[in-house]
Every structure is written in structure tokens, then in C-alpha cells.
């Protein structure tokens, strides 16, 4: 198995950037397209959790859940072969001084398109 094949890594970096851009403006349609349309898709948020693409879409419809001024740091993408990847990042937001956010996503290439199949977000006191 090839780890971080350059072509695959570039694909994942691009789709992650699209996800981040959609998240910051709460583009719910774009976000929904980036998640696997399945009842097996899971998202664990800071104060919430969803166990299907439908539940995730309903959560997103409630309104923005992210500070649009958040700043990513220590972002790491790792690909395994050509159809599986993880994206891990930390973030800081002016609206939450002294707090450090952590976000992890599992991506799979399904029917030729990269989709988030599992995601987890948490926030801790900054060390």
C-alpha cells in the first residue's frame, strides 16, 4: 500500500480545502455533497452528534456552527492507497480565546468522489 501517493494526496488536499471553504460560509448544499450519503456516516461535534447523512444535513440547516474567522494549524493529511485518507487539524477562533479546536475526518473515495465518512470535532482549553 502506498502512503501519501502525491496524486491522491493532492486530491484530498483540494477536497479538504473545498470542505473548509464551504464550512466557513455555511454552504449547506456543498457540505452535504462532501459527506457520504449513508446512514453509516457519523459526525461527532463539540456539543452534538449525528448518525447519518440526513441527521448531519438537518444539523447544518440549523445555522452556522463554525466561527468564520477560525484559523487552521498543524493540518495533516494522510492517504492510504488511492481511496482512503484521514485529515487532522487543529484550529483557533477569535470567538473562543484560550480554546483549541481539534478536527479529524475520515475520507473515502466512493464512486469516484471523495466523501467524509466519519468526522469528529472537539475543543479543549489551550495548553
Name each model feature, range by range.
Residues 35-36, 91-93, 120-123:
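Short beta-strand segments enriched in hydrophobic/aromatic residues
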Residues 51, 94-97, 124-127:
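A short local loop/turn or secondary-structure capping micro-motif enriched for an aromatic residue
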Amino acid at each position: 500500500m502506498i502512503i501519501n501517493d502525491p496524486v491522491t494526496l493532492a486530491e484530498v488536499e483540494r477536497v479538504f480545502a473545498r470542505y473548509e471553504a464551504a464550512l466557513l460560509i455555511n454552504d449547506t448544499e456543498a457540505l452535504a455533497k462532501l459527506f457520504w450519503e449513508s446512514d453509516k456516516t457519523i459526525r461527532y461535534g463539540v456539543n452534538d452528534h449525528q448518525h447519518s447523512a440526513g441527521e448531519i444535513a438537518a444539523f447544518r440547516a440549523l445555522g452556522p456552527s463554525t466561527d468564520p474567522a477560525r484559523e487552521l494549524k498543524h493540518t495533516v493529511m494522510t492517504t492510504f492507497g488511492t481511496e482512503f485518507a484521514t485529515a487532522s487539524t487543529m484550529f483557533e477562533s477569535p470567538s473562543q480565546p484560550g480554546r483549541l479546536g481539534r478536527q479529524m475526518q475520515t475520507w473515502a473515495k466512493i464512486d469516484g468522489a471523495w466523501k467524509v465518512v466519519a468526522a469528529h470535532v472537539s475543543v479543549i482549553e489551550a495548553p
